[in-house]
Amino acid sequence: MTRGQFRAFVKETGHRTEPETDGQGAWGYDEDTKKIEGRKPKYSWRSTGFAQTEEHPVVNVTWNDANAFCRWLAQRSKRPIRLPTEAEWEYAARAGSAMRFYSGESPETLVKVGNVADGTAKKKFPDWQTTIAEDGYVFTAPVGQFLPNRLGLHDMLGNVWEWCQDWLGPYGDLSAKDPVRNEENQVRLMRGGGWGKRVPQISSSALRFSGAPPSRDMDVGFRVAFRAD
């Protein structure tokens, strides 16, 4: 979801994100020190330390904040909107492809479909090991700037990690149809990788990360899902 969409939610509901209310703040980039900083009250979804327009993905929101947005949008749109399950997310990311990477067989093809740590980022962070390609974005890119997958979905890899509904656990031994783990008080899954991940770290659509529901970061956002009519 974009900053503009999240701002509309905040304006209508008065919602304040956990980084804004718990006193811990969020992650951000300090232009003076040229460094990424851990949680500080001066950072939130509103202020990340790097330039973002309303078309950039919202970041520094927790799993709880993302679910609050989903409840609001579901009520407003009269649709059962929620965070995607991990199974739904991976199906959407792979888009029916049997290749190692949904963009092709080579990890270098990912620069065409996702905002990853590349030559542009290396100019800002010389110590980073990156690809030589340059996409023009050090941090987040506006939503939809890269090629879509076969389902017409943009940014399924790169740009921001995306919260899923599930909690993190090992895959089962048996096949299952849309499995979901949704118990309370468990670490929650994130999928997709963010702008700071490099090839080959981000090279597989199976890449997983996790965090407690109140976790927040400058490369973590979300998308929503609903059942088609």
Regions found by a protein language model. Give the residues of each.
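Short, structured beta-strand segments at or near domain termini in extracellular proteins/domains
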Residues: 218-229
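Acidic-aromatic/histidine active-site loop/patch
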Residues: 2
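Functional-site microenvironments in short loops/helix caps that host divalent-cation chemistry
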Residues: 16, 21-209, 218
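Catalytic-histidine neighborhood of serine endopeptidases
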Residues: 11
